[in-house]
Amino acid sequence: MFKKFKPVTPGTRQLILPSFDELTTQGELEGSSSKRSVRPNKKLSFFKKSSGGRDNLGHISCRHRGGGVRRHYRVIDFKRNKDGVEAKVASVEYDPNRSAYIALLNYVDGEKRYILAPKGIKRGDRVISGEGSPFKTGCCMTLKSIPLGISVHNVEMRPGSGGKLVRSAGLSAQIIAKTDGYVTLKMPSGEFRMLNEMCRATVGEVSNADHNLCVDGKAGRRRWKGIRPTVRGTAMNPVDHPHGGGEGRHNGYISQTPWGKVTKGLKTRDKRKSNKWIVKDRRK
C-alpha cells in the first residue's frame, strides 16, 4: 500500500510514499499507543560508512552519489541454514539499505536473525528451514523439495552460497520444471534459467510490492537518500562529454556514456562465459 499527499507544498504535490502499514510499531512491542518505528537490533546492525561513490584511490567510480543520512547496515541471513529449528517473527522492520522490508526472527534456542520479509508475513507468524518444512510463506528449503508452480525468492546460484537472485521488493520466481538434478526457474525478467536442485529458496514473494509506484516529489528527498543531481551530456562542453558542445542544440550523434560507450542496444554479457544454464533469453 502507498499514500498520496494533499499538495499543500510544492514538495508534496507529486509525493507518493509507502504507507508502512505492514511494519511493526514500537507500541505493538510495548503494549502502548506509540506509532514509532522499531529500532534495529543492536547486535545485528552496525554503522555503514558512505563511500560517496569513490573507490580506494579516491576517484569517482559511481557518479551522482554523495551525502545523505547516516545508515546502519542490518546483517541479513541470506543462507537460511538453521535447519529444523522453528522461529517466530518478532517484528517486520524498514531497512534503508534495500527496497524490501526485513523480518526479525526469534528462534526457539534463543538466536535472533534478520531475513527478507516475504509478502503477507506478520508479527507472530512461525517459519522454519530445512527439508520437510511446510510449503508456506517464509519457509526455506532446497528447490528439489518445492512443488512446481510455487513462487519463490532469495534463490541461491550455487548450493550453500546464500541467496543471490530475486531479492528486490515485490519480486518472485516461479518453478517451471525439474530434470536430471536441475530445476528450471522463470525469473522476474522473463528469462528461464536452470539451477542446481540443491540450491535453496524461500517460499513466497518479496514484500513491499508497491515500491516501484513511489515518487520522491522533490530533489531534497533524493539528497536524503544520498543521490546527487545528474547533468545532461548536451549541457556540457566537448571536453566533458561526447554529447557536449555545438552551436545551439545538436542531435546528430549516437547516445553514449561520458567515456564513449554506446548506451542503447549494446550487449554487456561476457561472450566468453557459458550461457548453457539460460534456457530461454528474456528478449525472445
Swiss-Prot record:
Keywords: Ribonucleoprotein, Ribosomal protein, RNA-binding, rRNA-binding. It comes from the Bacteria. One of the primary rRNA binding proteins. Required for association of the 30S and 50S subunits to form the 70S ribosome, for tRNA binding and peptide bond formation. It has been suggested to have peptidyltransferase activity; this is somewhat controversial. Makes several contacts with the 16S rRNA in the 70S ribosome. HAMAP family: Ribosomal_uL2_B (MF_01320_B). Gene3D superfamilies: 2.30.30.30, Nucleic acid-binding proteins, Ribosomal protein L2, domain 3. One of its GO terms (cellular component) is large ribosomal subunit. The gene is rplB. Residues 240-250 have a biased composition (Basic and acidic residues). NCBIfam families: rplB_bact (TIGR01171). Pfam families: Ribosomal_L2 (PF00181), Ribosomal_L2_C (PF03947). This is Large ribosomal subunit protein uL2. GO terms for molecular function: rRNA binding; structural constituent of ribosome; transferase activity. Residues 36-46, 264-284 have a biased composition (Basic residues). Belongs to the universal ribosomal protein uL2 family. SUPFAM superfamilies: Nucleic acid-binding proteins, Translation proteins SH3-like domain. Residues 28-50, 232-284 are annotated as: Disordered. Part of the 50S ribosomal subunit. Forms a bridge to the 30S subunit in the 70S ribosome. One of its GO terms (biological process) is cytoplasmic translation. InterPro entries: NA-bd_OB-fold, Rib_uL2_dom2, Ribosomal_uL2, Ribosomal_uL2_bac/org-type, Ribosomal_uL2_C, Ribosomal_uL2_CS, Ribosomal_uL2_dom3, Ribosomal_uL2_RNA-bd_dom.
